[in-house]
């Protein structure tokens, strides 16, 4: 019986050690992947079109706001035949960002009160 107990403890110890090493490998891979995606995002961020600027050359190049990506909106000016495209933020997304900011500030106040 002592042998079975000793063997069980040894088996659990080896299993936990191998699990910890596998998790470390996964964490390292996740960190490498995260760093590469951040570098790609920074490289892509330099090429984006700011809000209210012309985006007719690339309609998917609008910059991101705090939470959402701006949308390339095209329209015909009054009395004009040429289409004009600019990066704009839709109103419903603007209101959602404002609500998220207010909720974040309110959450910070609650954390201060009870923190």
Swiss-Prot record:
Protein name listed in UniProt: U3-lycotoxin-Ls1a
Classification of source organism: Eukaryota, Metazoa, Ecdysozoa, Arthropoda, Chelicerata
Subcellular location: Secreted
One cellular component term from this protein's GO annotations in UniProt: extracellular region
Cleaved signal peptide residues: 1-20
GO molecular function: toxin activity
Organism superkingdom: Eukaryota
Assigned protein family: Belongs to the neurotoxin 19 (CSTX) family. 01 subfamily.
Tissue: Expressed by the venom gland.
Keywords assigned: Disulfide bond, Knottin, Secreted, Signal, Toxin
Pfam families associated with the record: Toxin_35
Propeptide: 21-44
Domain remarks in the Swiss-Prot or TrEMBL record: The presence of a 'disulfide through disulfide knot' structurally defines this protein as a knottin.
Disulfide bonds: 48-63, 55-72, 62-87, 74-85
Organism: Lycosa singoriensis (Wolf spider)
Entry keyword annotation includes Isomerase: no
């Amino acid at each position: 019986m002592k042998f079975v107990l000793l063997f069980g403890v040894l088996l659990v110890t080896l299993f936990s050690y191998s699990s910890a090493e596998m998790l470390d490998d996964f964490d390292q891979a996740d960190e490498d992947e995260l760093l590469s995606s951040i570098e790609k995002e920074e490289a892509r961020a330099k090429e984006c079109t700011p809000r209210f600027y012309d985006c007719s050359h690339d309609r998917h190049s609008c910059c991101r706001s705090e939470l959402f990506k701006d949308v390339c909106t095209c329209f015909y000016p009054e009395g004009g035949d040429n289409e004009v495209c600019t990066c704009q933020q839709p109103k419903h997304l603007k209101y959602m960002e404002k609500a998220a900011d207010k909720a974040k500030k309110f959450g910070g106040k609650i954390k201060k009160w009870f923190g």
